[in-house]
A protein has these predicted regions:
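Primarily membrane-embedded glycan-assembly and transfer machineries that use lipid-linked glycans
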Residues: 1-174, 203-317, 329-332, 377-386, ...
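Hydrophobic transmembrane alpha-helices
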Residues: 73, 88, 187-190, 323
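Aromatic-enriched
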Residues: 328-332, 342-413
Length: 413
């Protein structure tokens, strides 16, 4: 089933509206060509999106990571990128299930997770809107998610105690912190993972993540001093080259509020109040599950980052995959026992209903919903804005489930 789904994705990418152009991957590829000539932040790709030029907006460390791509022809890079994304998605699914197993004291090595479960999830996840757009555009978000989930997996197995350990406890802080720091060095926003480390009582891991991020900046400055200075003193925080925050593609809190308001609200009072409310609700949800598995803690932290960021494009929301896994296989889930085949200790039908809603909305996605609403004459206004707030809706749904079922959760975690 997984191979059939992956083959269908290749056909979709080649024959669909994006016609195998991988616009974001082409930006990475072009950045790799320009690493050494001092023009890393002076180009913008226009061949495939003339209406919206695409510059390279990541830190210089990301360009250094992409540098090996310059030695390969682009078609090879494109095919390899799809295979890498699918493979890492499978790894994310498997690690997520292992984290849940560790949280309830079951065997939690990757080999203890049934392969058929992980393949089934991966086959379906390839068609969820955020993953689908990552594959269409050649985006890097699944790679970054894999680094974050890997860090959580190391911590979860340490929390489970012997014989689950894969590293000595004193080395887990360094390894998990380094993974978060490397991800932040590539794209900045994964730095929110430091809050996850703190939420699991790992202050030294958070310190290591900061030190690792600093090392990526220092390494970049050593090799690309002018580009590094320019990025961190001039370009950082400038969302202009990235796009309009009010576009439906932007699923951050700022994007959702802006669509209801009919204009970009920026970082003014409406955004600050909304962010404060979102942070408070996410903290309340975390407080309920703070003694539970590491997966839900990681998901809640990532939701804070996605909602709080000025721009969170659809393809940034790949965290919907571990979110769905927790809803289905967590303590409230229909398949939440230690074998991932029976009801969890706190099972509630509401988790099944929520998972089904997430799947349907995720498979349809923002763009197709927007097309249908446009056909119905609802291309703006509050109804349109409501249906476009799918990321915010996912966060609200998860928070509501946790808070409504807090007694069940507190009894089993």
């Amino acid at each position: 089933m997984f191979l059939l789904s992956l083959a269908a994705r290749f056909v979709w990418i080649a024959a669909g509206q994006h016609n195998f152009n991988f616009v974001d991957l082409r930006v990475y590829y072009e950045a790799a060509q320009r690493v050494a000539d001092g023009t890393l932040y002076d180009f913008a790709l226009t061949d495939y999106t003339p209406q919206q030029p695409l510059p390279f907006t990541y830190p210089p460390f990301a360009a250094l990571c992409f540098y090996p791509l310059k030695f390969l022809p682009f078609p090879v890079v494109a095919v390899a990128w799809v295979l890498l994304t699918a493979g890492l998605l499978f790894l994310v699914v498997r690690m997520s299930l292992a984290i849940l197993a560790a949280g309830r004291g079951a065997p939690s090595r990757l080999g203890d997770v049934p392969v058929e479960h992980a393949l089934f999830w991966t086959a379906g996840a390839l068609w969820i809107d955020p993953v689908r757009t990552n594959l269409d555009y050649g985006q890097i978000n699944v790679v970054l998610m894999a680094l974050g989930v890997w860090a959580a997996y190391l911590i979860a197995r340490t929390e489970a105690g012997p014989p689950a350990l894969v590293l000595r406890p004193q080395r887990v802080d360094g390894a998990s912190g380094a993974l978060i720091g490397i991800a932040a060095g590539i794209k900045l926003t994964p730095a929110v993972g430091g809050l996850f480390l703190l939420s699991r009582g790992r202050p030294w891991a958070a310190v290591f993540s900061g030190l690792t991020f600093g090392a990526t900046v220092g390494f970049s400055y050593l090799l690309l001093p002018s580009e590094t200075r320019r990025y961190f003193t001039v370009l950082l925080g400038d969302t202009g080259p990235i796009g309009d925050p009010a576009k439906p593609d932007n699923q951050s809190l700022r994007g959702a509020i802006s669509r209801f308001a009919g204009h970009d609200v920026g970082t003014g009072a409406a955004w600050m109040v909304g962010l404060a409310v979102a942070a408070l609700l996410l903290f309340a949800a975390w407080w309920v599950v703070r003694r539970g598995d590491a997966l839900i803690a990681l998901v809640l932290v990532q939701l804070l980052g996605l909602l709080g960021s000025p721009i969170s494009w659809i393809h940034h929301w790949v965290w919907i995959v571990p979110l769905l896994i927790w809803v289905v296989h967590g303590p409230l889930g229909r398949l939440g026992d230690h074998r991932f085949s029976g009801a969890g200790a706190g099972y509630t039908p509401w988790s099944t209903a929520l998972a089904g809603t997430f799947v349907v909305v995720g498979l349809v996605g923002v763009h197709y919903t927007d097309d249908v609403l446009g056909w119905l004459g609802l291309s703006d206004g509050p109804v349109w804005a409501l249906f476009m707030a799918q990321g915010l809706g996912a966060a609200i749904g998860l928070i509501a489930l946790i808070l409504a079922q807090r007694r069940r959760l507190q009894a089993v975690v």
